[in-house]
A protein has these predicted regions:
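The serine-hydrolase catalytic nucleophile loop
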Residues: 40-52
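An N-terminal hydrophobic leader/cap segment in hydrolases
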Residues: 1-10
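Alpha/beta-hydrolase-fold enzymes
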Residues: 136-188
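Conserved hydrolase catalytic core segment
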Residues: 109-149
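Short beta-strand element of the alpha/beta-hydrolase
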Residues: 30-39
């Protein structure tokens, strides 16, 4: 029944910038899922019709293009350099909080399901830890459990393939030598 279903996209102002949110499902009364993509920069909104096939019968799914990603990037292209400087974990956590608040206002639900994939699991789990009162549950896919180990592992792999003595090698070594024991957002 098309009258019960939903397929729309919007650009609400979230944390001071236009951010792309796409909402799809066959019944607006189904539980709402906010999907947080990986990357950063790994939007799935363009292929969600494939990835969510079947799920949209049971859930209403909101896909969000994070700051400096795909449609959010293009909606703010004139401010992209300025926005790139604001991409901290705290900015992403605030974005998630404001998107949930926006979705709550527009779609009139009590709580939603938060689902994070890869990088999205890092910011999604942190949001869930801070704001469980807004969630039915949190689902992590490809959950990052130790961000530092993940970054250092990747950097060590990079050192094996980038040219020795290059500026890229210097940058990667700098990351290895200066990456904090605990991320600044991990206070517990």
């Amino acid at each position: 029944d098309n009258k019960k279903g939903i397929y729309l996209y919007e650009y609400p102002i979230i944390n001071g910038i236009k951010q792309y949110v796409q909402v799809r499902g066959t019944d607006r009364k189904n539980p709402l899922v906010l999907f947080i993509h990986g990357g950063p920069g790994g939007s799935v909104a363009g292929m969600c019709h494939i990835l969510q096939n079947g799920w949209e019968d049971k859930f209403t799914i909101a896909n969000w293009d994070q700051r400096n990603t795909c449609k959010t990037y293009f909606a703010n292209k004139d401010k992209s350099k300025e926005i790139a400087k604001t991409g901290t974990i705290e900015d992403f956590i605030k974005d998630i909080d404001e998107i949930i608040s926006y979705l709550h206002t527009v779609y009139d639900f009590e709580k939603l399901i938060l689902m994070g994939f890869s990088w999205g699991s890092a910011i999604g789990s942190e949001y869930a830890k801070r704001h469980p009162e807004n969630l039915l549950c949190y689902i992590g896919i490809g959950q990052l459990t130790n961000y530092r180990e993940n970054v250092l592992f990747t950097c060590k792999k990079l050192l094996k393939i980038i040219p020795k003595g290059s500026k890229d090698e210097e940058k990667v070594k700098h990351i290895i030598n200066t990456f904090p024991e605990r991320p600044s957002w991990d206070k517990n």
